[in-house]
């Protein structure tokens, strides 16, 4: 959650008077913050030069069995 979003909620809850704001007003502002964050996230995800996830690496070659000396360690007992 964005710090702006949390700051807005905190200001609303901590204020002795809500400055004539209603819950509907607060909800409208918070929805606007959330929409803006979604738009920014969509831009970041779709950015071709700066992808959020690295491209997948090549999967290991499973056509050949592993050498005999590379067995997995035994599972730890509880």
From Swiss-Prot:
UniProt KW keywords: Early protein, Host cytoplasm, Host nucleus, Host-virus interaction, Inhibition of host adaptive immune response by virus, Inhibition of host TAP by virus, Viral immunoevasion
Superkingdom of source: Viruses
InterPro entries registered for this protein in UniProt: Herpes_ICP47
Bilayer-spanning residue ranges: none
One Gene Ontology biological process: symbiont-mediated suppression of host antigen processing and presentation
Bias (Basic and acidic residues) ranges: 38-50
Location of the protein in the cell: Host cytoplasm; Host nucleus
Pfam families in UniProt: Herpes_US12 (PF05363)
GO cellular component terms, semicolon-separated: host cell cytoplasm; host cell nucleus
Domains: entry comment: The N-terminal active domain blocks peptide binding to and peptide transport by TAP.
Physiological role: Plays a role in the inhibition of host immune response. Binds specifically to transporters associated with antigen processing (TAP), thereby blocking peptide-binding and translocation by TAP as well as subsequent loading of peptides onto MHC class I molecules. Empty MHC I molecules are retained in the endoplasmic reticulum and ultimately directed to proteasomal degradation. In consequence, infected cells are masked for immune recognition by cytotoxic T-lymphocytes.
Assembly behavior: Interacts with host TAP1 and TAP2; these interactions inhibit the loading of peptides onto MHC class I molecules.
Family: Belongs to the herpesviridae US12 family.
Name by which UniProt lists this protein: ICP47 protein
Organism encoding this protein: Cercopithecine herpesvirus 16
Gene name linked to the record: US12
């Amino acid at each position: 959650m964005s710090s702006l979003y949390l700051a807005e909620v905190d200001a609303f809850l901590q204020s002795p008077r809500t400055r004539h704001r209603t819950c509907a007003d607060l909800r409208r502002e918070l929805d606007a913050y959330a929409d803006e964050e979604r738009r920014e996230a969509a831009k970041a995800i779709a950015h071709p030069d700066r992808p959020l996830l690295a491209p997948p690496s090549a999967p290991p070659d499973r056509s050949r069995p592993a050498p005999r000396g590379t067995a997995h360690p035994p599972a730890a007992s509880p």
